[in-house]
């Protein structure tokens, strides 16, 4: 008995079962992917998905972006019915699209429409990286092109927020065609005197960065956004050199003249509102 009483203590502790752990409802908390601090999700939504601790800009949903920018109740969505097909009969493509539709409540990886920012009417497009990583297929190209053409016809500015991993490989050459299609629409719009503002968010890469995303009258970016065509590893293997640690970040692009300004997300509405108002005459402010 005494031997049992003074025996060596175990050097390990029991781990509580899953049932004994605190029951936290799914979606209640959100961890910052940069500093790893945990917040209530509603706090992050209120902060526009910017970490209060490290200022890291997390991806926003398309509709959260719209709510953060537009005058209350003024946004009208366009072309929601345009969706992706499967022209190459790519295996499992349709099921993946269906899964993303259910997850995001979006019909495609871009939302387009018009509304007012600081009482200025604009045509608008916002890409959502939660849907197929914002990859550009024929449906996204068509929706963006239509939005640009509507801006030209109505003589209003066009503003786009990009977030994309590039062209959608499941659609092959049809996805690559969207680079030329959207870029030509931008050229026609700008030739007619239209104002285009592009805001590149994390990430803006591949065919999107090499087409409409980087040819606005103003090209802005959010802090820390990854902006580039090919990936770092591919470039390093090709040129056989080590790239700078900040290569392809928004700040790197600003330093090298590829973007005009890096704008904090919480300053975006005010900055765009002032810029749009500066460019518009009194007739368009009614």
From Swiss-Prot:
<keyword id="KW-0862">Zinc</keyword>
<keyword id="KW-0275">Fatty acid biosynthesis</keyword>
<keyword id="KW-0444">Lipid biosynthesis</keyword>
<dbReference type="Pfam" id="PF01039">
    <property type="entry name" value="Carboxyl_trans"/>
</dbReference>
<dbReference type="GO" id="GO:0008270">
    <property type="term" value="F:zinc ion binding"/>
</dbReference>
<keyword id="KW-0067">ATP-binding</keyword>
<keyword id="KW-0479">Metal-binding</keyword>
<dbReference type="GO" id="GO:0009317">
    <property type="term" value="C:acetyl-CoA carboxylase complex"/>
</dbReference>
<feature type="binding site">
    <location>
        <position position="32"/>
    </location>
    <ligand>
        <name>Zn(2+)</name>
    </ligand>
</feature>
<comment type="function">
    <text>Component of the acetyl coenzyme A carboxylase (ACC) complex. Biotin carboxylase (BC) catalyzes the carboxylation of biotin on its carrier protein (BCCP) and then the CO(2) group is transferred by the transcarboxylase to acetyl-CoA to form malonyl-CoA.</text>
</comment>
<keyword id="KW-0276">Fatty acid metabolism</keyword>
<dbReference type="GO" id="GO:0016743">
    <property type="term" value="F:carboxyl- or carbamoyltransferase activity"/>
</dbReference>
<feature type="zinc finger region" description="C4-type">
    <location>
        <begin position="32"/>
        <end position="54"/>
    </location>
</feature>
<dbReference type="GO" id="GO:0006633">
    <property type="term" value="P:fatty acid biosynthetic process"/>
</dbReference>
<dbReference type="GO" id="GO:0003989">
    <property type="term" value="F:acetyl-CoA carboxylase activity"/>
</dbReference>
<comment type="subunit">
    <text>Acetyl-CoA carboxylase is a heterohexamer composed of biotin carboxyl carrier protein (AccB), biotin carboxylase (AccC) and two subunits each of ACCase subunit alpha (AccA) and ACCase subunit beta (AccD).</text>
</comment>
<dbReference type="InterPro" id="IPR034733">
    <property type="entry name" value="AcCoA_carboxyl_beta"/>
</dbReference>
<feature type="binding site">
    <location>
        <position position="51"/>
    </location>
    <ligand>
        <name>Zn(2+)</name>
    </ligand>
</feature>
<feature type="domain" description="CoA carboxyltransferase N-terminal">
    <location>
        <begin position="28"/>
        <end position="286"/>
    </location>
</feature>
<dbReference type="InterPro" id="IPR011762">
    <property type="entry name" value="COA_CT_N"/>
</dbReference>
<dbReference type="GO" id="GO:0005524">
    <property type="term" value="F:ATP binding"/>
</dbReference>
<dbReference type="GO" id="GO:2001295">
    <property type="term" value="P:malonyl-CoA biosynthetic process"/>
</dbReference>
<dbReference type="InterPro" id="IPR029045">
    <property type="entry name" value="ClpP/crotonase-like_dom_sf"/>
</dbReference>
<keyword id="KW-0443">Lipid metabolism</keyword>
<dbReference type="InterPro" id="IPR000438">
    <property type="entry name" value="Acetyl_CoA_COase_Trfase_b_su"/>
</dbReference>
<feature type="binding site">
    <location>
        <position position="35"/>
    </location>
    <ligand>
        <name>Zn(2+)</name>
    </ligand>
</feature>
<feature type="binding site">
    <location>
        <position position="54"/>
    </location>
    <ligand>
        <name>Zn(2+)</name>
    </ligand>
</feature>
<comment type="pathway">
    <text>Lipid metabolism; malonyl-CoA biosynthesis; malonyl-CoA from acetyl-CoA: step 1/1.</text>
</comment>
<keyword id="KW-0547">Nucleotide-binding</keyword>
<protein>
    <recommendedName>
        <fullName>Acetyl-coenzyme A carboxylase carboxyl transferase subunit beta</fullName>
        <ecNumber>2.1.3.15</ecNumber>
    </recommendedName>
</protein>
<keyword id="KW-0963">Cytoplasm</keyword>
<keyword id="KW-0808">Transferase</keyword>
<comment type="similarity">
    <text>Belongs to the AccD/PCCB family.</text>
</comment>
<keyword id="KW-0863">Zinc-finger</keyword>
